[in-house]
Amino acid sequence: SRSQLLLVTDELWSHPRSVYTDIPETSNYLDHLGLLAKSLPSTIQQSLELRRHLGQRVVGHPVESWWLNQLPTIDMGDSSIPFSKIVKNAKLVIVAHNGTTIPENFSRGIPTLITWTSNWVEIRDEAKPIFAKLAEVGIFHEDPVSLAKHISAIWDNVDAWWESKEVVEARELFCSQYAKSVPRPRKFLRQIIVGKLTMGQQGDL
């Protein structure tokens, strides 16, 4: 049975590249996630598994010792297991970065929460109403303590919350912009490549 609370983290850069939205090691990223973890009830903390970004050792310092100091019981995860398999076995996924995991999980119906602050992720103006809706139904949280409270509230029946009318509507709103499925994807891609459609029509965070 699915029992894990999976926390998917981003890489932290010792020397962030100015032309990208790299998160620097000097940011409050780890403090934010540490507060989230420590604000969870102990029973849920024991279910917490970390999925660290595979590029962390290349672009910055290892984070294992930091996490184990914060929460000695945390499961540091096994990077040799494919991410798709780990996600499938999770009861609930927390995504702490703006990446493909969010639209992929939404389109596959995997219960997923999002947390970040404007310090690390800047939401484009056209996406703000969508994220406001995600926040309204409890999917998106900028405050780690409110996220921990929400997880505690839904933990005993995650699926009931995830399949509730308002949450389904918010997910569909997001997917209509950022995870749209098309009946003939190869033809659709070919049309984009030859310029008959623009990627802007598909939405972009």
PLM regions and their residue ranges:
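Donor nucleotide-activated moiety binding/catalytic core segment of transferases
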Residues: 47-103, 107-108, 118
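Hydrophobic, Leu/Ile/Phe/Ala-enriched alpha-helical segments that form helix-helix packing faces
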Residues: 32-44, 67-71, 105, 151-155, ...
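Long, low-complexity, Lys/Arg-enriched
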Residues: 9, 71-75, 150
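Catalytic binding pocket for nucleotide-activated donors in carbohydrate/polymer assembly enzymes
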Residues: 68, 92, 97-178
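Conserved phosphate-coordination/catalytic loops
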Residues: 23-31, 77, 179, 183
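Conserved catalytic-core segment of nucleotide-activated headgroup transferases in glycan assembly
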Residues: 1-66
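C-terminal alpha-helical cap of glycosyltransferases
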Residues: 177-205
